[in-house]
Amino acid sequence: MKQKISIVTVVKNGMPFLKDCVKSFQSQNFSSKELIIIYSKSEDNTEQYLKKLKGSIRVFKDVKYKNKFGPLNFGIKKATGNIVGILHADDFYPNANVLTNVAKSFNTTKCDVLYGNILFCSKNRKKIVRKWISRTFRKRDLALGWMPPHTSIYVKRVEIIKNLYSIKYPISGDYKFILDLFHK
């Protein structure tokens, strides 16, 4: 099956990190992709930068949601890909093969949800300060507080639309999202 991957990014005052985020998306060697950016009014030239973006990048203005989970849901609903992932404005892909590997994994495993590793780096992005290494999923680990980071998760669109982020939980909306997603 031909995959298309939609990536959702929410940003407010995201410069200069947003440039690295977008550049890492654009450098992906997987061609059937789109980046959906939802932005809030910023005071750091974010809006001016976004106006210059073209191609597979779609930009929407935030409509005053209570927290970051509302704009994420908005972006997910705008996604046209059959796979959806999240890339925060201050995050970036470590190499050009990430989306290709995601698509291959969906094709070979026939899974609905996929998650992977995350590297945390210093502000200057030159030094890795922490690694979150994925492991085989065990449902019981969720009850113990373990969860894969939501930015490492890719979900089939038909599944994520049924399991959007709850805006009732401004701090733990991502945890609730993961619990709902993995408890189906």
Model-derived regions: residue spans:
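Short aromatic/hydrophobic "clamp" motif used to bind/position activated sugar donors
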Residues: V84
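Glycine-rich, basic loop-to-helix element that forms the pyrophosphate-binding segment
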Residues: D62-A79
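A conserved acidic beta->alpha catalytic loop
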Residues: Y39-Q48, H88
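Short beta-strand/loop segment that forms part of the nucleotide-sugar
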Residues: K33-K41, F60-D62
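Conserved nucleotide-sugar donor-binding catalytic segment
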Residues: R130-K184
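Conserved donor NDP-sugar-binding/catalytic core segment of glycosyltransferases
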Residues: A96-I128
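Short, acidic, metal-binding catalytic loop of nucleotide-sugar glycosyltransferases
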Residues: K23-S32
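N-proximal low-complexity "stem/linker" segments adjacent to membrane-targeting elements
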Residues: M1-S24
